[in-house]
Amino acid sequence: KFALSWMKDLINHAKKRGLYVQFSFEPRITSVEQTVATVHDILKTYPNIDALELITEETGGWGAGCTRAETEATLNNFFDKSVATDSAVNAPIKEKQSDLNALYMQIGIISKAIKQLNMDKTMHPEFKLGIYCSITPYTKGAYRLARLALPETKICLMSSHGSEGTAQALPSVVLTSQDRKMTEIYSWIEFDGLMYLYQNSISGNEKMMKWLSDSSDNTVSSILFNHWRSAENRTSARFATEATLDATVSAERFYRAYANRLSITDKKRFIEAMQLVNRADVFATTNLGNIGFCWMGAWGNGGSYTWMSKDNIDYARTIYLNAGNLLKDILKQTEKGTEANHYLSFICNRVLCSVLYLDAFREAVNIQGVIGKNQTAESQAKVKQICDKALLIFDQYMAKHAEMLEDRGCEGTLVSVWNSPIRGLKIYRAQFGGVPMDVPSSLDAVDAPPLPIVY
């Protein structure tokens, strides 16, 4: 009840200030009738929303398996023959694969539900169909399917993880000027799979805006930018704001203007540092999949410590460390008490936190060589030693992060890291090291390494 009341107040607050409010939910695989009933419940609860998006659940390769026959049967069941047999819709179908049948089925359910809802002319909000799919061949087919099934309905498209992936995927999915007019693009200011690392999404959003501005008709319905926090994202969010007003704004020009406003004198090294963070962001999104995922469920069985690549961790860590050292030198040149000093101090803090997070992960993945079905006393002791050291580094991460709590989002990050990756590592320590979950980080006080950046 509290959550519903809070959301109502938030929506009413936004409406009073003239904002357009769009609500989104995942019907998932249920009946058309149940989906329509859920829509009515949502509109009864939140009558002031302007639009309601019915979006597919995320498709990324981990879903249920399916056969060609099953997917073709789904197409024939939900869509007209001309749609079901469209070459672009059928292009990603294989004899055996994961996810695609579920994705197409959800589009079928949503499209039928929207058609039924649109028959009632008294319905107030605009209905939109959302697609969240990070497998580009699937995205192409799904987007084409949605456009053919609902040509007068806006499609909300989340085509990848991170802004760089979005910029790469969009040109092969959204093909025509009419497609652009009927598409709401989801991009990213911040990716939830890297929540515990400092991020910079500017290069990807720069490329996306260039793609839009270079097209013969640069009209697009709208662009939605995913993000969860404010303090960590002030620079990336500012770029997204300026780029949507002027798509010709380059990243370098933006950085120079940003540094000017803050009176940062060493603009060259500031730009270099921010580009390094951007590079680390792109690399981690691609090669350290969900290493900082803020969803607790990802860590329910322990998490990614058993398969994450140490080489990739080292590579990302080096980039962050180089960025941190540049920022540290710039910070020394700024006067204490100035906005530039506060801004750079915060970024230095979060870059250092990123290094510490990767240090903890780098230590924790050493369990890969000692875990197994038949743990010996020796291997259990080794697992415990590895986990204890990693947990102490996580303690360093939390302590450093807590030095600069700019807003509730910063506080929430601490709660999240404790309940997700730290808890996940304790699950492995209990499972393979025989240590109860409620035991502190270390009983033996293994020395944690010194902090890599001092400022």
Tell me the role of every PLM-derived stretch.
Residues 1-120:
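Substrate-binding cleft of carbohydrate-active enzyme catalytic domains
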Residues 18, 44, 56-62, 86-455:
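Substrate-binding groove of N-acetylhexosamine-processing glycoside hydrolases
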